[in-house]
Amino acid sequence: MLDDLPEQFDLVVIGTGFTESCIAAAGSRIGKSVLHLDSNEYYGDVWSSFSMDALCARLDQEVEPHSALRNARYTWHSMEKESETDAQSWNRDSVLAKSRRFSLDLCPRILYAAGELVQLLIKSNICRYAEFRAVDHVCMRHNGEIVSVPCSRSDVFNTKTLTIVEKRLLMKFLTACNDYGEDKCNEDSLEFRGRTFLEYLQAQRVTEKISSCVMQAIAMCGPSTSFEEGMQRTQRFLGSLGRYGNTPFLFPMYGCGELPQCFCRLCAVYGGIYCLKRAVDDIALDSNSNEFLLSSAGKTLRAKNVVSAPGYTPVSKGIELKPHISRGLFISSSPLGNEELNKGGGGVNLLRLLDNEGGREAFLIQLSHYTGACPEGLYIFHLTTPALSEDPASDLAIFTSQLFDQSDAQIIFSSYFTIAAQSSKSPAAEHIYYTDPPTYELDYDAAIANARDIFGKMFPDADFLPRAPDPEEIVVDGEDPSALNEHTLPEDLRAQLHDMQQATQEMDIQE
């Protein structure tokens, strides 16, 4: 196929990770000619989702010096005990038999319902390519147990984990946080400016349990977090409540690997060309035309702009990698927490874990079959923490012991791996734009900011991902753009249109 490609492009994007796919879609959407290449045979790179077989094959792959996925290992476990209520006995063979029913993320994320990504998906109309599942519970560990943190007003008053007094205190505190910012000169802002958010909580005389709820699950901050940042995080949480469910979070159906592909679809709709299993062998800058010359599979391509993921170009492959994110991925035949957290066959839950000193943290995402990420009767646990070493199992040991040592979770499969990042920025002497690797964050804010920044440098006067019209809104040459297809309108607008037409007819009769 590469032989049939045009030789000239406005933009060549190398790598199909989330950030690269955003940039490719944004370029194609404003009418730029885009070529999107990836040396892998699948979309997404470390942002991808895999079937069970494909994940094992990926973890078994020999690690190349520039590969972002490293230190990988996995283990199949024999079941120590089987529940009498289990409809199916799970083991390695039965799990692999349903390999295609799995969608296992290397780099899982949760979306704030009013966060940057959701707003971008709606604004650009890319949301039509994606489906989401509301997260059922935001949890924390309290006195050795996993408990649900009440988010909405109804949750607060229905929860059995708080006393009546604590419920009132929590509602009063959340109301104060929600009002913060409307008057930045209020007494609290002045009194606690330069102090910590924990000091503010203590001054409100909330109980230890409420303080844990706020610090661990709502603001998701630490003892040294400033008052201003703690308020901003709490407001972000509250601002996403009540949109799509009881919690402020969403998870992509069929795994996070669907999201880069959503942007790739938009890029292709607007003329972007895709070539998988195609590497770039060499890149040079033509000093006369100020264009890039890219050599790939024996063909020379010309591009005005080049964007690449780290490690995908010859010049960036020599950069040393260092551990960045330590990951654990587990498959179990039973969920974490009590029955209340897992009604109807298992909840989609989020849990923030802290070490004993509170200096380190990890995020756990529990997925059930309701997300389309695994077969019914199985559960996926995604565990993520900033890397401290080349041994992800050691980095995560303090958290896995909290989760599994005293729980009834029946682990069938466990895997550990590291997502690495370059120890220094890729050389930019040739003016190639290199995207950042995945960072340790809950949502996609950093990746979107990175995509916006690179796009703005290439096309400073262009809008980043303007709304794409729906198919019925597209006017073909020769059609009357003012003509409306009544059947494509919502019912209320159809009624208004009918009334307007009748009124017009009556005016004609009167005249």
From Swiss-Prot:
Name of a matching Pfam family: GDI
Any one GO cellular component localisation term in the record: Rab-protein geranylgeranyltransferase complex
Subcellular location: Cytoplasm, Perinuclear region; Cytoplasm, Cytoskeleton, Spindle pole
InterPro entries reported in the protein's UniProt record: FAD/NAD-bd_sf, GDP_dissociation_inhibitor, Rab_escort
Keyword list, A-Z: Cell cycle, Cytoplasm, Cytoskeleton, GTPase activation
Recorded GO MF terms: GDP-dissociation inhibitor activity; GTPase activator activity
Cysteines paired by S-S bonds: none
Main location group: cytoplasm
Gene Ontology terms: biological process: intracellular protein transport; neurotransmitter secretion; positive regulation of protein localization to endoplasmic reticulum; small GTPase-mediated signal transduction; vesicle-mediated transport
PANTHER family recorded: CHM, RAB ESCORT PROTEIN 1, RAB GDP-DISSOCIATION INHIBITOR
Role summary: Binds unprenylated Rab proteins, presents it to the catalytic component B, and remains bound to it after the geranylgeranyl transfer reaction. The component A is thought to be regenerated by transferring its prenylated Rab to a protein acceptor.
Family, per entry: Belongs to the Rab GDI family.
Protein name in the entry: Rab proteins geranylgeranyltransferase component A
